[in-house]
Regions:
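Substrate-positioning beta->alpha
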Residues: 139, 167-172, 187-209, 216-220
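Conserved Rossmann-fold NAD(P)-dependent oxidoreductase catalytic core, especially the SDR/UDP-sugar
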Residues: 87-133, 155
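Amphipathic terminal alpha-helices
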Residues: 291-295, 304-322
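NAD(P)H-binding glycine-rich loop region in Rossmannoid oxidoreductase-like domains
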Residues: 39, 47-87, 95, 110-115
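N-terminal Rossmann NAD(P)H-binding glycine-rich loop of SDR-like oxidoreductase domains
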Residues: 3-23
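Flexible, glycine-rich beta-alpha linker
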Residues: 114, 152-171
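Active-site Tyr-X1-5-Lys
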Residues: 130-155
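Mid/C-terminal beta-alpha module of Rossmann-like enzyme folds, strongest
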Residues: 207-273, 290, 310-311
């Protein structure tokens, strides 16, 4: 098949593109500057961004399938995130409709649904985001439902926190663990979270590409189990082959750190990864159910927590990130 991918040079996107190439597909990817992880791979680069309708047309010409993974994950203003994640996605969707692309898969996020409380969230729960990024993804999903026609086949996937080789944000957790400390965000080691290895997100994306029924279909894609911080600590310690000491980080401390770091970054014109918005997200429980994607797309988790963390840490060590 001819497949067009946005966000193909990023963390999840580069793994998806590699999987598509291994399956023998012709892959074009939207590129703003460098191919990064895809350098040397037999991909067809299409220079441009989501504002460049002509580039989108070029990428989708004759395409059998479009994967939309490009997104802005942080910005100091809601309108900046909305412009990238909602308006940019609408440009892509409308261009795909005009090009007659038979299947579109778009990456959303658990952040669009919001945190969980008494049980893992399902696709039937109302969307209640608590971060600016989550709001932008919620608005993106709502735009898709408004814009989709009766003949469209669109799948929205919502992963939680994604880890694996090439990931640069959760990396900081493993770097701290490499010094013998396991930070427990929120302070409760028994708090439960969903997280997923990038290989399983790619599996979900590939399966979603095969679902050709008309309509908009939404799925969480995650680990089949939810984990506690204690389980994450144990798996990380085993992979690092060292004992980890717990460092509880109460919500107020995390929020203070996010606020302080954001203000400090502002002095230098930077918006840091840890900011007030991110701190607000980090202090909640985030769990989701994968029963729907298991039932309808036959999804099965392929990497356990222990195997996934071990695989990730080995890659970080091999590339001198740890």
């Amino acid at each position: 098949m001819k497949i067009f991918v946005t966000g193909g040079t990023g963390f999840i996107g580069s793994h998806l593109v590699e999987a598509l190439l291994e399956q023998g597909h012709e892959v074009r990817t939207l590129v703003r500057s460098k191919l990064k992880w895809l350098a040397g791979r037999p991909v067809v680069p299409v220079k441009g961004d989501l504002d460049n309708i002509e580039a989108l047309r070029e990428g989708m010409r004759g395409a059998d399938l479009v994967y939309h993974l490009a997104a802005l994950v942080k910005a100091p203003k809601q309108e900046t995130l909305n412009y990238a994640n909602v308006e940019g996605s609408e440009n892509l969707l409308r261009t795909a409709q005009k090009a007659g692309v038979p299947k579109i898969v778009m990456l959303s996020s658990l952040a669009a649904a919001g945190p969980s409380f008494s049980r893992p969230l399902t696709e039937e729960d109302p969307l209640m985001p608590i971060s600016m990024y989550g709001v932008s993804k919620k608005l993106m999903e709502e735009m898709v439902h408004r814009t989709a026609t009766g003949s469209d086949s669109i799948t929205l996937l919502r992963p939680p926190a994604v880890y694996g080789p090439r990931e640069e944000q959760i990396l900081s957790f493993f770097q701290i663990a490499g010094r013998g400390i396991c930070p427990i965000v929120g302070g409760n080691a028994d708090a439960r979270i969903s997280m997923v290895h990038v290989d399983d997100v790619v599996q979900g994306l590939l399966l979603a590409g095969t679902k050709r029924e008309q309509g908009v279909h939404t799925y969480f894609v995650s680990s089949e189990d939810v984990y506690t911080w204690n389980q994450i600590k144990t798996a990380t310690g085993e992979a690092l082959q060292r004992r980890l000491f717990t460092l509880p980080l109460p919500p107020k401390l995390v929020q203070l750190a996010g606020s302080t770091i954001e203000r400090a970054g502002g002095l230098f014109g930077a918006y840091p990864d840890l900011n007030r918005d991110k701190a607000r997200e980090m202090t909640h429980q985030w769990t989701c159910s994968v029963e729907k994607i298991k039932r309808e797309l036959k999804y099965r988790q392929t990497r356990s927590l222990q195997d996934g963390i071990r695989h990730t840490i080995r890659w970080y060590q091999k590339h001198n990130w740890l």
